[in-house]
Amino acid sequence: MIKSDNFNFYKDSLDYILRVQSLDGSISWEQNKKLDPWDHIEAAMGLIVGGKEHEARSAFIWLKENQEEDGSWFSEYINGMPASLRKESNFTAYIATGLWHNYLITKNKSLLKEMFSTLDSAMKFVISLQTSFGDINWAKEKNEILDDSLITGCSSIYKSLDCAISIYKILGYESKDLAESKGLLKACLLQNTERFDRGWKSKERYSMDWYYPVMCGVIKGNEAKERIQGRWHEFVIQGMGCKCVVEEPWVTIAESSELVVALVAIGEKDKAKELFDWLHQWKDPQDNLYWTGYVYSDQKYWPVEKPTWTAGAVLLAADSLFEFTSGSKLFLEEWEDMDRYEIK
């Protein structure tokens, strides 16, 4: 029996992403289903963990070829066509995290150079949505800014800004605007939390709002440990995984995998390994793929989906735990000031 610390344990997840990926490089949730840019990138990151450099590059080239003039992407595509006119800031920013992750693993700058103009346009779009308070509005639709911000989305953007700044430095470009944006965003996330969820019910009931500031490096050290410990009993079901929403009896594999990364980031590797081990029971024995989630009150998988982004999240969590690649510390380091990490 293959152990979970052996990469072959995850080969079916890698192969699944490859099967779903279209010839144009796009990676939808499932075969012939919708695509969103964030999850497309998450799946592409799973590909590069598995050493699929050509296929991962193809996924980034799809982004290059489908970028809007303002630097953004639409939030949803079906069969290559936009299915929504909304443009979400964290979806657009995530290209930076994906590209930096790719660089850490491939050890060359070719894709960074090829994609730099795409990245630059994307980051300009993102920081154009930043308010004077430091938060970044969550979306734009029909040229109108949707005036509210998300803790999870802004935490993800914070990590993407860190990765983008690192790319700019590696390639010799000025990144002062991005660094200022990152500093303002962090200050807002830490000190001005009333800027978030102003126009809707608080998202604190979602586990992502709990662990994302830790996973993405906004909150560190003892404060990060206290944050995770403080709501652990609310979100984590022993022997099962992490709930998506605090009041729902539903553990989800992607959120649980991200929580694994957050635990590794705060030095709780044994706890991360225990949590990760619980997740493998949620694979379909027919094809060895992970379901989206499990409703334990009904003892049913729901929804009846096996998304590529769940496969990608599992691959990233496995890498953070077992260090299969040189990208395993992607979420464990603050890269902006680490010139020593440049790979010649």
PLM region descriptions:
Residues I2-K34, R57-K87, F116, S121-D148, ...:
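Extended glycan-interaction surfaces of carbohydrate-active proteins
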Residues S28-Q31, I78, K109-K113, G172-K176:
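Short, surface-exposed loop/turn segments at secondary-structure junctions
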Residues H54-E55, L111-E114, T118, K176-D177, ...:
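Alpha-helical positions within canonical tetratricopeptide repeat
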Residues F91:
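Extracytoplasmic catalytic/substrate-binding loops of multi-pass membrane glycan-assembly enzymes
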Residues I151-R195:
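Active-site neighborhood of glycoside hydrolase catalytic domains
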